[in-house]
Amino acid sequence: MALKIHDAYKKGDVLAIDRLLGKKQFDAVIALDVIEHLAKKQGYELIRKMSWLAKQKIIIMTPNGFYKQDPYDGNKWQIHRSGWTVDDFYKAGFTVRGIRGLKWLRGEYATLKWKPWIFWGIVSVLTEPLVYFLPRLAYQLFAVKEIES
């Protein structure tokens, strides 16, 4: 049996979240694989707006650096418009961890570059503890910013 955890959904422009939702309305505001689909300037705007919405923290997950990604299945919103680095997040006050294994193992759409995929998938998993503490080597970044009250 699934728990009902959401009562209402809002659909709209992610850069208009401050107009759709109230200030400090959520304990945490999370953007998973979103920010890279915005231009860099828009990404920083999103971070500011997420900070406005959050009481305690904001969490962002994104590829480490720029990865070319074209429209998928005709969806123009799948295009990557920016790349984000550990230093980008450090400068914005985030703590950063690495996830999804070594950066050079994956390519477009986060797919493993080489076959057999099972072998390279195991290699990716085995490198997770390393990239967690050395996020510059990771394929994906997990960035957390504590909001000061």
What are these regions (language model features)?
Residues 30:
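A conserved beta-strand element that flanks and buttresses the S-adenosyl-L-methionine
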Residues 20-25:
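Glycine-rich phosphate-binding loop signature in dinucleotide/nucleotide-binding domains
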Residues 15, 19, 39-149:
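S-adenosyl-L-methionine-dependent methyltransferase catalytic module, highlighting the catalytic core
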Residues 7, 27, 56:
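Conserved acidic residues
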Residues 33-37:
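Histidine-centered divalent metal-coordination motifs
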Residues 1-17:
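Class I SAM-dependent methyltransferase SAM/SAH-binding core
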